């Protein structure tokens, strides 16, 4: 199943308002209507435009689609719905709304409608389950991992009358979407508390908390690491094995490097929602060795006499 970017299909920006979305849909519908267009793929493009407007023209579906886009789906590329996105158009009694794609069905089920009349909503019997709010601490490495993160949490149980009867532990494997940031809120549809008397499950809301890293500071998509250097390494140049989120790299330190200098390593930062990675900045820090014995102090004395170096010459200008 391939990902469909409905914004690209209609040719609008993700920030487009309802009026712009409707105008873009009308334009494409007129252009590719099978009774008007002679293009070979007109019918397919007409269906795509209808499907795109079915989603973007409905506030609830658009919000759900925007959540899905956070997982880094790219138009025309293979895609699998993340955990918690249930097909609600099957046995639940959704309305049949047209010839929609597998992608649409995997996200929205069969909840269709008239593009100009608004989508018809399924009415569920019983009482909807309670939403669950959790904070999820993640490490920087997990934002790049393709592995799922297992979480366990308590959800309330209710009887047929909707009265709480206790709690049960629920365990999920959650894929951390690319580009996630501290404080971001992720919704997992239908993964909250179970409904009663046939009602829909509640949702699980995860608030992301980035755990502090012992080596890296974060500046947007970029990472900063402090690289300690001995004075002779900074003066003569060297190669240093520098940690990154996905293994060590050999960093070349040029002669006459200065403390505080930053070296940029492209593509070793954090990923955005499209999977593109920021930079790693290696900030050099010259660390002085202890001069605790006479021979070491003598070497420093000899260096000071030979170098005749004054780091404060600019003060006399």
From Swiss-Prot:
Q: Which CDD domains match?
A: DnaJ, DnaJ_C
Q: Principal place where this protein is found?
A: cytoplasm
State the InterPro entries in the record.
DNA-bd_curved-DNA, DnaJ_C, DnaJ_domain, DnaJ_domain_CS, HSP40/DnaJ_pept-bd, J_dom_sf
| Signal peptide boundaries | none
Presence of keyword Chloroplast:
no
* GO CC, any one term: nucleoid
**Which Pfam families is this protein grouped with?**
DnaJ, DnaJ_C
Query: Start and end of every J domain?
Result: 5-69
Q: Which SUPFAM superfamilies match?
A: Chaperone J-domain, HSP40/DnaJ peptide-binding domain
**Keyword presence, Glycosyltransferase:** no
The protein's location, in the record's own words, is: Cytoplasm, Nucleoid
Gene Ontology MF: a single term: unfolded protein binding
Q: Name one GO biological process term.
A: chaperone cofactor-dependent protein refolding
Q: What are the UniProt keywords, alphabetically?
A: Chaperone, Cytoplasm, DNA-binding
Functional description taken from the UniProt entry: DNA-binding protein that preferentially recognizes a curved DNA sequence. It is probably a functional analog of DnaJ; displays overlapping activities with DnaJ, but functions under different conditions, probably acting as a molecular chaperone in an adaptive response to environmental stresses other than heat shock. Lacks autonomous chaperone activity; binds native substrates and targets them for recognition by DnaK. Its activity is inhibited by the binding of CbpM.
Name of the protein in its database record: Curved DNA-binding protein
Which species is listed as the source? Pseudomonas putida (strain W619)
Q: Which gene encodes it?
A: cbpA
């Amino acid at each position: 199943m391939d990902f469909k970017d409905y914004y690209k299909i209609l040719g609008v920006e993700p920030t487009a308002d309802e009026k712009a979305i409707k105008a873009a849909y009308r334009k494409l519908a007129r252009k590719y209507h099978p009774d008007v267009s002679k293009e070979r793929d007109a019918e397919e493009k007409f269906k795509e435009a209808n499907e795109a407007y079915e989603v973007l023209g409905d506030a609830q579906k658009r919000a759900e689609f925007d959540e899905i886009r956070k997982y880094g789906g790219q138009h025309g590329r293979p895609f699998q719905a993340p955990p918690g996105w249930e097909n609600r158009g099957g046995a639940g009694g959704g309305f049949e709304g047209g010839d929609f794609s597998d992608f649409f069905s995997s996200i929205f089920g069969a909840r269709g409608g008239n593009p100009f009349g608004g989508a018809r909503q399924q009415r569920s019997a019983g009482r909807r389950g309670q939403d669950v709010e959790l904070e999820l601490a993640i490490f920087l490495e997990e934002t790049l991992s393709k592995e799922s993160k297992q979480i366990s949490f308590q959800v309330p149980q209710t009887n047929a009358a909707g009265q709480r009867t206790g709690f049960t532990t629920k365990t999920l494997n959650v894929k951390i979407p690319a580009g996630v940031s501290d404080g971001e809120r992720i919704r997992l549809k239908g993964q909250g508390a179970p409904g009663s008397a046939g009602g829909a499950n509640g949702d699980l809301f995860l608030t992301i908390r980035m755990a502090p890293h012992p080596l890296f500071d974060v500046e947007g998509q970029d990472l900063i690491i402090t690289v300690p250097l001995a004075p002779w390494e900074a003066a003569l140049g060297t190669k240093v094995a520098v940690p990154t989120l996905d293994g060590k790299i050999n960093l070349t330190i040029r002669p006459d490097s200065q403390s505080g200098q930053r070296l940029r390593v492209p593509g070793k930062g954090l990923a955005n929602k499209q999977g593109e990675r920021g930079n790693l900045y290696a900030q050099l820090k010259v660390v002085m060795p202890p001069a605790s014995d006479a021979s070491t102090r003598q070497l420093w004395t000899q260096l000071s006499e030979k170098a005749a170096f004054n780091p404060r010459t600019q003060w006399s200008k």
